[in-house]
């Protein structure tokens, strides 16, 4: 057989077999862009034209004019995005079919393969491959098959095939089936008689299975995840995703727990046309084998929507079967530290100058004590606001009508009506602001005392109370800036502010507390107009608040340091928080806040409230975090006196929580050891009770297609004999050692994270946070 140069062969074939395209072929062969030199997805490329030029290059040619041509020796066949290489290729001219044999490779921009034989119909764009290894280029997935046929534009049928998301030479897991149908347009793979293999060992079989293979929403099973823990034993989670419609979907998850039974979860999501979006979740565990065969269940419904740009609709309703639900079960409905579940609905309307809302609110209490909050059945709010003299005088009215209801007969039900008109003079320049405000707080109570079982409380309260209290506030702030002298190259700002607040004293002992708590008096709280969160208690005030903030900015105007400090001078000592007539000072505690960022790897935040009367700290918190290339380490501390807690929250049995206040220290860290291994951990200790609060350590391996994690947790769940400082010296802990395994690549419910990322998603009571408040 005569040998020809490759260029001469290409021109000869084009002339002899495809004369109409000879000129085009000559041009194409002078180009260096016949095909991409690397394997890449060409799904967005222009589709192949069945009449497009066919370019064949080979070392040898045996041609039968008008019938077929046989090419051999480094054969390449290209047509548009298609490319076939083989030891020999036979072109059947009449049928427009190419048959390639011997070390065949195939690439059409969507899939690449190596086979012993490939048959390609250039007209219908169908092909078949025998004894093939393949890889999808536009989605994750590769595998092997005895026979592959492309029967549609993006439909592949495989016989005796396998598929995995693992890279080449890695068969950590794979799905093997007698028949597989892959639809790349629909991004689904249908398996007949599939078996799931781990390291070539079968671990699961099903007669039929459909899985998504892309990132779009497709109906089908998602890959299961496996976990083993000392608390619940072996756990296997199998999710099924149902793409009901473009704006509706449903995820059904079956969770098998060796020591508990089978738990069913459902998550329905929707997006309505003009009504907003919502989500309905449900969980059900029949006959919990670990807890006396009790049926455990929970559900949650949330909806938020804005209608016609003016109406707002919001619904948030959750309920579980028992108060220990989150303590005993891992749930998407809440966390183990939740003390109550919200059950509320709200409808609101807003216009340019007024808004109104109707709200109902209830709670499911998840605590054993009797500290029940009030229900709002309902609460109606109306607000009006308008400028009177351009930008120099504003008028507004805040009002509400609330019905408070509670099942506890030791507390009264009540109707509260409140109207609060106000005038505001806002003055501002580029370097200063001055706001003066006068308000009138008028409130009416109708309290139901007939049902009270507490005679002492009944004698203190009045059935009807009308209260009118004026309020005056004037707040000024200046912004100054200069080149810093202490730190060269930095810009320093100074922001002093001062506020005068006057609220006359009013006897309010005849009003019960329905929804009011004391607000935290940190630096920013010094300049509020109210000390309480609501209006059941209006604290008297005749005081001057003053303070300042200074900030340092680098040459890119990135904030690197700020310090804020201030306090209150009580002109009338009787208006101090404690109301103690024996107070020796007219000054409040000093409030100090600071944040620091050094070169974006060392961060610090600290805050204190220091009582100058007692020469003691009331509240403090401090966090220092060091970040490096592959991880971080953080130390934190928080301190609150018991007196401060008693003044701030209402809790009948505070000794069950603390006897000396809060003094807790913790350390949190995470490190990516290398590309695959990562570790994280955290530890918290209570310095007042001298006991551990929480341990957590995690080690995780993550490959390209699977992951495995090992986690140890030890969490405090019960104080000594239910009372802090009780006779027992042995607090109760919940200890769990778990191993979880999962698949990555496609058709997974949750993507695996590194151990560092998992600090944000664990069920720990104290989660990782970054309380750094610099303006960057």
Curated annotation (Swiss-Prot):
Q: Where is the signal peptide?
A: 1-24
Q: Does the keyword Membrane apply?
A: yes
Determine if Membrane is one of this entry's keywords. yes
Biological-process GO terms, alphabetical = Gram-negative-bacterium-type cell outer membrane assembly; lipopolysaccharide transport
Where found?
Cell outer membrane
An example Gene Ontology CC term for this record: cell outer membrane
Key words of the record = Cell outer membrane, Membrane, Signal
InterPro entries in the cross-refs = LipoPS_assembly_LptD (IPR020889), LptD (IPR050218), LptD_C (IPR007543), OstA-like_N (IPR005653)
Relate the protein's function as given in its record.
Together with LptE, is involved in the assembly of lipopolysaccharide (LPS) at the surface of the outer membrane.
* Similarity remark: Belongs to the LptD family.
Outline the subunit composition.
Component of the lipopolysaccharide transport and assembly complex. Interacts with LptE and LptA.
The protein here is known as LPS-assembly protein LptD
Q: Which organism is it from?
A: Vibrio vulnificus (strain CMCP6)
Question: Organism classification, top ranks?
Answer: Bacteria, Pseudomonadati, Pseudomonadota, Gammaproteobacteria, Vibrionales
């Amino acid at each position: 057989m005569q040998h020809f140069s490759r260029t001469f062969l290409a021109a000869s074939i084009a002339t002899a077999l495809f004369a109409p395209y000879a000129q085009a072929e000559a041009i194409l062969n002078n180009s260096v862009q016949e095909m991409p030199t690397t394997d890449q997805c060409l799904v967005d490329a222009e589709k192949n034209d069945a009449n497009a030029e066919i370019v064949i290059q080979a070392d040898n040619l045996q041609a039968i004019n008008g019938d077929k041509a046989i090419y051999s020796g480094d054969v390449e066949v290209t047509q548009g995005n298609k490319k076939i290489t083989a030891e020999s290729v036979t072109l059947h001219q009449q049928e427009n079919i190419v048959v390639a044999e011997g070390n065949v490779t195939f690439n059409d921009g969507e899939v690449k393969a190596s086979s012993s034989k490939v048959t390609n119909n250039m007209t219908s764009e169908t092909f078949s491959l025998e004894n093939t290894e393949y890889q999808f280029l536009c989605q994750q997935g590769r595998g092997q098959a005895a026979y592959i046929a492309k029967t549609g534009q993006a439909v592949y049928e495989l016989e005796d095939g396998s598929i995995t998301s693992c890279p080449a030479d890695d068969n950590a897991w794979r799905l093997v089936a007698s028949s597989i149908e892959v639809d790349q347009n629909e991004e689904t793979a249908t398996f007949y008689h599939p078996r799931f293999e781990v390291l070539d060992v079968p671990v699961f079989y099903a007669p039929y299975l459909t899985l998504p293979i892309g990132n779009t929403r497709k109906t089908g099973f998602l890959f299961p995840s496996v976990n083993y823990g000392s608390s619940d034993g072996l756990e296997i989670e199998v999710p099924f995703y149902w793409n009901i419609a473009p704006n509706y979907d449903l995820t059904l998850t079956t969770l098998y727990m060796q020591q508990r039974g089978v738990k069913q979860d459902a998550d329905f999501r929707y997006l309505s046309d003009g009504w907003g979006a919502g989500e309905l979740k449900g969980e059900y565990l029949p006959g919990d084998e670990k807890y006396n065969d009790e049926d455990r269940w929970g559900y949650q419904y949330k909806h938020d929507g804005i209608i016609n740009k003016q109406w707002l609709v919001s619904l948030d309703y959750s309920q579980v079967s028992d108060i220990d639900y989150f303590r005993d079960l891992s749930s998407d409905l809440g966390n183990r530290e939740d003390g109550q579940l919200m059950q509320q609905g709200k409808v609101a309307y807003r216009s340019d100058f007024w808004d109104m809302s109707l709200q109902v609110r209830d709670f499911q209490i998840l605590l054993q004590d009797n500290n029940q909050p009030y229900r709002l059945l309902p609460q109606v709010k109306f607000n009006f606001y308008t400028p009177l003299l351009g930008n120099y005088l504003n008028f507004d009215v805040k009002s509400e009508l609330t019905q408070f209801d509670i099942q506890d007969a030791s507390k009264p039900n009540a109707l509260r009506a409140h109207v609060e008109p106000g005038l505001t003079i806002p003055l501002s320049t580029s370097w200063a602001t001055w706001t003066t405000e006068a308000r009138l707080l008028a409130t009416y109570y109708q309290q139901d005392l007939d049902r009270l079982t507490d005679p002492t409380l009944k004698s203190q309260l009045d059935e009807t109370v009308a209260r009118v209290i004026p309020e005056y506030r004037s707040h000024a702030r200046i912004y100054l800036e200069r080149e810093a002298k202490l730190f060269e190259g930095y810009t320093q700002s100074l922001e002093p502010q001062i506020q005068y607040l006057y609220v006359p004293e009013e006897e309010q002992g005849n009003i019960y507390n329905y929804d009011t708590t004391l607000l935290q008096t940190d630096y920013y709280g010094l300049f509020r107009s109210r000390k309480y969160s609501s209006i059941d208690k209006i604290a008297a005030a005749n005081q001057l608040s003053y303070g300042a903030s200074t900030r340092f900015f680098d040459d890119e105007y990135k904030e690197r340091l700020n310090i804020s400090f201030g306090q209150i001078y009580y002109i009338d000592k009787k208006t101090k928080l404690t109301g103690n007539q024996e107070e020796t000072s007219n000054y409040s505690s000093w409030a100090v806040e600071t944040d620091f960022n050094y070169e974006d790897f060392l961060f610090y935040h600290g805050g204190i409230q220091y009582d100058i009367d007692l020469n003691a700290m009331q509240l403090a918190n401090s966090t220092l975090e060091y970040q490096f290339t592959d991880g971080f380490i953080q130390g934190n501390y928080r301190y609150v006196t018991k007196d401060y807690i008693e003044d701030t929250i209402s809790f009948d049995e505070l000794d069950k929580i603390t006897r000396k206040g809060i003094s807790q220290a913790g350390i949190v860290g995470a490190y990516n050891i290398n590309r695959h291994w990562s570790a994280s951990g955290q530890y918290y200790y209570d310095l007042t009770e001298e006991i551990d609060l929480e341990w957590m350590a995690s080690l995780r391996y993550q490959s390209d297609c699977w992951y495995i994690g090992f986690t140890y947790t030890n969490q405090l769940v019960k104080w000594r004999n239910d009372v802090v400082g009780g006779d027992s010296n042995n607090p109760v802990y919940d200890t769990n050692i778990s191993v979880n395994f999962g698949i990555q690549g496609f058709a997974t419910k949750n993507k695996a994270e590194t151990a560092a990322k998992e600090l944000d998603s664990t069920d720990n009571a104290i989660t990782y946070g970054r309380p750094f408040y610099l303006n960057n």
